[in-house]
Regions:
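Bacterial N-terminal signal peptides that target proteins for export
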Residues: 1-8
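C-terminal motif of bacterial Sec signal peptides marking the signal peptidase cleavage site
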Residues: 17-20
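Secretory pathway targeting signatures of secreted, lumenal, and periplasmic proteins
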Residues: 25-28, 34, 41-47, 184-248
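Solvent-exposed alpha-helical segments and adjacent loops
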Residues: 26-44, 49, 104-166
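N-terminal "mature-domain start" segment
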Residues: 30-35, 43, 47-50, 60, ...
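Signature of long, low-cysteine stretches enriched in small and polar/charged residues
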Residues: 74, 78-133, 237-298, 312, ...
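Surface-exposed amphipathic alpha-helical segments
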Residues: 135-156, 187, 300-355
């Protein structure tokens, strides 16, 4: 009995001591963050949030529509609380923006902290000396704010994909293209063509699809909107037919295709997002593509995610696939750990001694 009591007392002491232990300024028992993907908590005075320019400016940024979707869907689901209510319960939210407006500051500034009170978590603080400069700064940096939290959410998806992804498709992509990519495990069905692979969940609704294809890099106009759409349509017409003869995938109205030059692994990439449709059928949905240059092999490698989800919200489905596009690893590259976020911002290391 004495030995049992001794071991019990040791266990009790460990339970009392360990939660207070620190490693790199953080508790060993960091709680899991609360909230769903693409939910945002804004910490700002209620009157300022609802009635004044500073609040209206921030709401206007966060309440914008996601580009490239057939129906309007907001970038984030937003909640607001006052600073006095930002307690232990609210601090573990996954995405937080804190408005810090004080005359001690000389100019507006963005800074962020990761995993301060929970994990995974991103807290952005927007500092400004007054409300007018806050509003002006937020409006000017609206896309920076959106990209920061969008890519942070995608990084969480990449972490999940690293732990669990479709190994069969990764192996197929390796043998066909000499590349690696992580896609969700439920894309089990696949089709192989010439320099082409298509993986799909093959569901009637909320159908997720991934495509990879390549072609020689020979044209100076390769990374233009017109060239990309022409190449995409020619590849999809051959490889993604419809239910009946004469049906095939094509890009919907090119006027609604948005393109951008982006950075992936510190290398140039061409991004396109828009809508696809099935010629001769009533099917369609959104797509997003990345085209990258594989210089040693003189080719362009394109990865694309597209969704067929009639009467369903598509934001989270598309962003899940978009995160997978960032995991494309060309020959002689190493697999990505995360998308770069917060470039040009100050990252503050968390020291949460009072969780």
């Amino acid at each position: 009995m004495k030995r049992i009591a001794f071991y019990f007392s040791l266990l009790l002491m460990a339970m009392l001591v360990l939660p207070s232990c620190k490693k790199g300024g953080k508790s060993l028992f960091t709680p899991t963050s609360s909230g769903n993907p693409y939910e945002m908590l804004v910490v700002m005075d209620k009157d300022m949030w609802e009635n004044r320019p500073a609040g209206r400016a921030l709401f206007g940024v966060l309440d914008t529509d996601v580009p490239g979707l057939p129906q309007p869907e907001r970038s984030f689901r937003i909640s607001q609380i006052g600073p006095n209510h930002f307690d232990r319960t609210m601090r573990i939210f996954r995405n937080i923006i804190v408005a810090d407006i004080q005359p001690i500051y000389t100019q507006p500034k963005l800074k962020y902290t990761r995993d301060a009170y929970a994990s995974p978590q991103m807290i952005m603080t927007i500092q400004a000396p007054d409300e007018a400069s806050f509003a002006e700064y937020v409006e000017k940096n609206g896309q920076v704010i959106l990209d920061f939290f969008t890519k942070s959410e995608m990084n969480r998806q990449i972490v999940s994909l690293k732990k669990k992804h479709n190994d069969l498709i990764s192996t197929k992509v390796g043998s066909l293209f000499g590349c690696d990519v992580w896609i969700p495990t439920d894309l089990q069905n696949y089709k192989v063509g010439k320099d082409f692979l298509w993986a799909s969940t093959n569901r009637a609704t909320a159908d997720l699809n991934f495509v990879i294809y390549s072609y020689p890099y020979t044209d100076k106009d390769t990374f233009t909107k017109e060239y990309f759409i022409h190449k995409r349509d020619s590849v999809m017409k051959i490889n993604i037919p419809g239910a009946q003869e004469g049906m095939y995938m094509t890009t919907a109205d090119s006027a609604f295709v948005e393109v951008a030059d982006i950075n992936v692994r510190n290398e140039y990439a061409f991004e396109a997002r828009g809508l696809w449709e099935m010629e001769g059928d009533m099917m369609g949905g959104p797509f997003v593509s990345h085209a990258r240059v594989d210089r040693p092999n003189g080719r362009v490698v394109v990865v694309e995610g597209f969704v067929f989800a009639p009467e369903k919200m598509k934001r989270n489905l598309m962003r899940q696939l978009e995160a997978a596009l960032y995991t494309l690893t060309l020959p002689q590259e190493h697999q990505i750990e995360e998308i770069v976020v917060g470039a040009g911002m100050t990252e503050e290391k968390s020291d949460t001694t009072a969780r």
